[in-house]
């Protein structure tokens, strides 16, 4: 959906079409989805029923094609204000986003965790839809090709270009060291336990396996000073398994595919080891995740990811 005057816009309603007796209990936490680098939220309107209120936030600067003043941190702060003051949402919520939206969601959660008394919402979990580890633009390998995106509207392309410039120097906020705890949670009709330093991984075939992280994560002194008092909310990653097409014939991966062959999309060893609890494969490349051919499958994967987020607990 192209941006409208409403922001955020409600995409799904929990109780719509339900009998009163079915929806009389506590409503599940609403899911707020943040736009991707193109600035729009059309993809989120293709997702099937998630049995909860779902909202989407588009880029307020989309139609003006202007860069965002204040960068990623300014964007995160403004989107929290939209949730609280415009949508009127309070209490526990889930955040999510595709690509850039995952980074913004993580930044919003970090901002709230750093000063929880300043906000009316708290973050119960994060759904990251193919948000690979962010390599700042200045650190990309020389000759990194652009993705081959066909038929992209001018405003979407300008939004993508603005994001490229915004991410040239920006780095993700840090959450601190791992707690060293084991965790338990449910997925589908199964219950799982993960040991410290492991992540649950589900392939397209539906088989689950524990993946051991290969690199321990250590903080610099400066990063330690920026760590919130609480740990990160649980996150689940959707991982596209196909490399995106690129311009030219170099054969090199584009920006979003720098870590495509890694099961954790580059996050291993670079971030808090407690944050990502599971990775679920998606039958697509990065820019094709919400193709109508896969939307039913993606919807079920998102439901499973949310179930993991909502059931994860330390295994004590």
UniProtKB/Swiss-Prot annotation:
The Enzyme Commission number assigned here is 3.1.-.-
Name the encoding gene, please.
lcsE
Name the job this protein performs: Probable thioesterase; part of the gene cluster that mediates the biosynthesis of the lipopeptide antibiotics leucinostatins that show extensive biological activities, including antimalarial, antiviral, antibacterial, antifungal, and antitumor activities, as well as phytotoxic.
Which InterPro entries does the record associate with it?
Answer: AB_hydrolase_1, AB_hydrolase_fold
Please state, per the UniProt record, what induces or represses the expression of this protein: Expression is positively regulated by the leucinostatins biosynthesis cluster-specific transcription regulator lcsF.
Presence of the UniProt keyword Cytoplasm in the record: no
The family classification in the record reads: Belongs to the AMT4 thioesterase family.
A Gene Ontology molecular function term for this protein is: hydrolase activity
Q: Which Gene3D superfamilies match?
A: alpha/beta hydrolase
Q: Describe the inactivation phenotype.
A: Abolishes the production of leucinostatins A and B.
Q: Does the keyword Membrane apply?
A: no
Its annotated pathway reads:
Secondary metabolite biosynthesis
Instruction: List the keywords (alphabetical).
Output: Hydrolase
Q: Which protein is depicted?
A: Probable thioesterase lcsE
């Amino acid at each position: 959906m192209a941006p409208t005057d409403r922001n955020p816009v409600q995409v799904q309603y929990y109780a719509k079409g339900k009998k009163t007796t079915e929806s009389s209990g506590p409503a599940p936490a609403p899911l707020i989805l943040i736009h991707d680098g193109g600035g729009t939220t059309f993809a989120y309107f293709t997702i099937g029923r998630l049995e909860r209120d779902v909202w989407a936030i588009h880029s307020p600067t989309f139609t003006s094609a202007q860069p965002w003043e204040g960068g990623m941190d300014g964007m995160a702060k403004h989107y929290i204000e939209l949730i609280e003051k415009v949508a009127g949402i309070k209490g526990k919520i889930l955040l999510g986003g595709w690509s850039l939206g995952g980074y913004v969601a993580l930044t919003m959660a970090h901002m709230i965790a750093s000063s929880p008394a300043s906000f009316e919402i708290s973050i119960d979990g994060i759904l990251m839809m193919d948000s690979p580890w962010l390599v700042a633009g200045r650190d990309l390998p020389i000759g990194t090709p652009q993705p081959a995106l066909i038929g992209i509207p001018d405003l979407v392309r300008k939004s993508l270009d603005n994001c490229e410039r915004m991410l040239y120097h920006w780095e993700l906020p840090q959450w601190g060291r791992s707690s060293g705890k084991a965790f338990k949670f449910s997925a589908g009709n199964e219950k799982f336990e993960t040991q410290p330093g492991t992540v649950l991984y589900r392939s397209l075939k539906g088989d689950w396996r524990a993946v051991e992280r290969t690199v321990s994560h250590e903080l610099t002194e400066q990063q330690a000073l920026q760590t919130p008092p609480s740990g990160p909310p649980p996150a689940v990653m959707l991982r596209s398994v196909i490399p995106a097409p690129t311009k030219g014939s170099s054969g090199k991966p584009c920006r979003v595919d720098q870590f495509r062959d890694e099961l954790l999309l580059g996050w291993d060893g670079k971030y808090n080891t407690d944050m990502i609890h599971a990775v679920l494969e998606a039958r697509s490349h990065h820019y094709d995740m919400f193709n109508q051919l896969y939307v039913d499958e993606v919807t079920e994967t998102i439901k499973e990811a949310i179930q993991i987020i909502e059931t994860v607990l330390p295994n004590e």
